[in-house]
Amino acid sequence: MEEEFPTISLLGIDFNLSNILMITVTCVIVLLIAIICTRNLQRRPTGKQNFIEWVMDFVRGIINSNMDWKTGGRFHVLGITILMFVFVANMLGLPLQIAVNDEVWWRSPTADPIVTLTLAIMVLGLTHYYGIKMRGFKHYFVGTYLSPMKFLFPLKLVEEFANTLTLGLRLYGNIFAGEVLLTIIATQLAHINIFVGVLAIIPAIIWQAFSLFIGAIQAYIFTMLTMVYMSHKVSDEH
């Protein structure tokens, strides 16, 4: 199933307008959630404040499972941002896809490998940055690439490439597969009679719920692996 997307060319480079739109929408939604949930904070949290505090505690638990809080506390906001961004991005294409003139405008941005691999590269780039910043270049390089044995250096380089590739493609594969199946189900529903269609709605709803679960799990996995890779770079014991 080949899809077409609106593009714009700038300086000889083609940009996917659908990705730009959906990433912007994702950022706006995450920003609104943060603003709404942190407005009028109370000593006894209720409702939306309970939700944002649960998210904060959840990410704190992820960090604490990989490194001590003294080291990992500075990545708390990063973890919250990644978790919420990836989750919202995963959800956008679940209820509907919008196409205009056979060009898809509305779908999950994480259903595009360019988006997920870019996220992975940014995350791995941050791990290297903080590793050098917190440990110094020499200590970081020796501890990361020459420990425990120097001859493992080529394998360590392969590992860096593999980590980046799998972090991005895992997220892409799960979200893309979910959207493809939902599209197939919706297409089949449009070509059958109303009585069979009513019955066919049931598996569609079940798959929607399953895709919601998968989207949440993938957001958790992406955040968890971010902190795992970060701990490998900034913690001496790794």
From Swiss-Prot:
What domain of life does the native source organism fall in?
A: Bacteria
Keyword Transport assigned = yes
SUPFAM superfamilies xrefs: F1F0 ATP synthase subunit A
Cellular component terms, GO, for this chain's entry?
A: plasma membrane; proton-transporting ATP synthase complex
Q: Which UniProt keywords apply?
A: ATP synthesis, Cell membrane, CF(0), Hydrogen ion transport, Ion transport, Membrane, Transmembrane, Transmembrane helix, Transport
GO biological process terms, alphabetically, are: proton motive force-driven plasma membrane ATP synthesis
Membrane topology field: Multi-pass membrane protein
Molecular function, one GO term: proton-transporting ATP synthase activity, rotational mechanism
InterPro entries from the UniProt entry: ATP_syn_F0_a_bact/chloroplast, ATP_synth_F0_asu, ATP_synth_F0_asu_AS, F0_ATP_A_sf
What subcellular compartments does it reside in?
Cell membrane
Residue spans crossing the bilayer: 17-37, 75-95, 112-132, 172-192, 194-214
PANTHER family, alphabetized: ATP SYNTHASE SUBUNIT A, CHLOROPLASTIC
Report the function annotation for this chain: Key component of the proton channel; it plays a direct role in the translocation of protons across the membrane.
The entry describes its oligomerization and partners as:
F-type ATPases have 2 components, CF(1) - the catalytic core - and CF(0) - the membrane proton channel. CF(1) has five subunits: alpha(3), beta(3), gamma(1), delta(1), epsilon(1). CF(0) has three main subunits: a(1), b(2) and c(9-12). The alpha and beta chains form an alternating ring which encloses part of the gamma chain. CF(1) is attached to CF(0) by a central stalk formed by the gamma and epsilon chains, while a peripheral stalk is formed by the delta and b chains.
Q: Which family does this protein fall into? A: Belongs to the ATPase A chain family.
This chain's protein is named ATP synthase subunit a
Gene source species? Listeria monocytogenes serovar 1/2a (strain ATCC BAA-679 / EGD-e)
